[in-house]
């Protein structure tokens, strides 16, 4: 803001970081302060698949809405593919109900034999019954665990996605700490909607956000290097001399 106030255009400013999940905190502040930005070689934090999935589970608990339902009903796989979803959509239109209610009503239908539909409904009902009494951070951790979502990511070996979920949990915890008594699930979901619907008018005068890897061979007038702390940069995965050398090379790229 100080630089911009002195006449520097946003596009001359670049923020570098070691790992993608760092962007969450930077993005939240930039959005709050109305600083335009663009992420290079990465997806905005709240638009990442695993973040959208996690938030869809929370929305399903609170609202049981169709968009959230379609996003996670078969993630992880529950054998609820296109044919069964089409059946639910037709039923929902005919009976003017939500897809979730359509599924709940038809659990005994032959079409859902051999699926995990009943377990899915039981899971959501279990959380929906008492979510208002639980902390959002605890709710999030529990649903990601009990739904099998985190296990699915571990099985796939998606460490970056797990790191992003850990960052989401941290952001929920920070949100609770700042809101105190007012931190209801509904309140949080409307707060987070501000970040997920961020399609501000596109003008190219934006601060660039990118990893140090992406910045190799590039130069910018103003560079901010953030989160240079032990465990982030150098990465917590640095357990050999060779890996530490690689971290040093990356730091050199960032500085030069």
Question: What are these regions, as identified by a protein language model?
Answer:
Residues 222-224:
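Structural motif
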Residues 2-6, 29-36, 57-60, 64, ...:
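Conserved, well-folded catalytic cores of nucleic-acid-processing
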Residues 1-68, 155, 159-160, 207, ...:
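Conserved motor-region signature of P-loop NTPase helicases/translocases
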Residues 1-12, 94-107:
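Coupling/hinge elements of helicase-like and P-loop NTPase modules
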Residues 86-92:
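C-terminal helical "lid" of AAA+/P-loop NTPase domains
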Residues 227-256:
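C-terminal accessory regions
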């Amino acid at each position: 803001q100080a630089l911009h106030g002195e006449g520097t255009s946003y596009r001359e400013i670049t923020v570098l970081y070691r790992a993608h999940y760092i962007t969450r905190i930077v993005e939240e502040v930039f959005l709050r302060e109305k600083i335009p930005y663009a992420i290079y070689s990465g997806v905005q934090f709240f638009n990442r698949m695993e973040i959208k999935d996690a938030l869809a589970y929370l929305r399903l608990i609170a609202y049981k809405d169709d968009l959230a339902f379609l996003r996670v009903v078969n993630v992880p796989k529950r054998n609820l593919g296109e044919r069964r979803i089409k059946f639910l959509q037709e039923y929902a239109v005919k009976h003017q109900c939500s897809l979730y209610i359509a599924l709940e009503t038809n659990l005994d239908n032959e079409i859902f034999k051999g699926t995990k539909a009943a377990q899915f409904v039981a899971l959501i009902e279990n959380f929906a019954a008492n979510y208002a009494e639980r902390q959002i951070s605890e709710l999030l951790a529990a649903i990601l665990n009990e739904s099998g979502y985190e296990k699915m990511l571990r099985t796939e070996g998606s460490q970056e996605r797990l790191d992003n979920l850990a960052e989401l949990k941290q952001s929920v915890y920070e949100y609770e700490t700042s809101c105190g008594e007012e931190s209801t699930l509904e309140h949080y979901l409307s707060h987070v909607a501000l970040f997920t619907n961020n399609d501000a008018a596109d003008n190219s005068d934006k601060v660039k956000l990118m990893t140090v890897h992406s910045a190799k061979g590039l130069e910018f007038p103003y560079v901010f290097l953030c989160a240079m702390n032990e465990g982030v940069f150098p990465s917590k995965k640095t357990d050999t001399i060779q890996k530490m050398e690689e971290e040093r090379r990356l730091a050199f790229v960032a500085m030069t």
